[in-house]
Curated annotation (Swiss-Prot):
The lineage of its organism: Eukaryota, Fungi, Dikarya, Ascomycota, Pezizomycotina. Its main location: mitochondrion. Residues 1-41 are annotated as: Disordered. One of its GO terms (cellular component) is mitochondrial outer membrane. It comes from Neurospora crassa (strain ATCC 24698 / 74-OR23-1A / CBS 708.71 / DSM 1257 / FGSC 987). This is Mitochondrial import protein 1. Residues 25-41 have a biased composition (Low complexity). One of its GO terms (biological process) is protein insertion into mitochondrial outer membrane. Keywords: Membrane, Mitochondrion, Mitochondrion outer membrane, Protein transport, Transport. Required for the assembly of the TOM (translocase of outer membrane) receptor complex, which is responsible for the recognition and translocation of cytosolically synthesized mitochondrial preproteins. It comes from the Eukaryota.
């Protein structure tokens, strides 16, 4: 036995593992063109077009507005449904506003108590040093 055969014990096993970094040759049955010229190149960046800018503006500016409108109308609808069905004593107006009288849809008049203040007494209170 020679010194080269003793130093490499894996050569006797008969297992050959090819390296990933090995340069492979093209098979003979392949077309004469090189693979890089026959397949299109992968484009990683494309400059923005007017259509892509418009599309992204609609997505980022208009859709949140529509989403907020839908959420608002959904909340109004749910509150109205709860009021009309009488779920858990839902009231449209709080108890503190019961003394008001409605004059139109969503408009109420509340009487404010007014006390008569004598102008001279009022000025005396404002200008007193006590």
């Amino acid at each position: 036995m020679s010194a080269e055969e003793i130093s490499n014990p894996l050569a006797e096993s008969g297992v050959t593992i090819s390296s990933d970094s090995e340069q492979y040759s093209a098979p003979e049955s392949a077309s004469p063109q090189s693979p890089s010229s026959s397949s299109p190149a992968v484009v990683l960046y494309q400059p923005p077009t007017v259509w892509s800018l418009f599309r992204s503006a609609v997505i980022n500016l208009f859709l949140p507005f529509v989403n907020g409108m839908m959420l608002g109308f959904g909340e109004l609808f749910a509150h109205e449904a709860a009021f009309r069905l009488g779920w858990s004593n839902t009231k449209v107006f709080p108890v503190s506003r019961r003394d008001a009288r409605p004059i139109g849809p969503g408009v109420e008049v509340v009487e404010r108590p007014r006390r008569r203040v004598d102008l001279d007494d009022h000025l005396d209170e404002l200008t007193s040093l006590e």
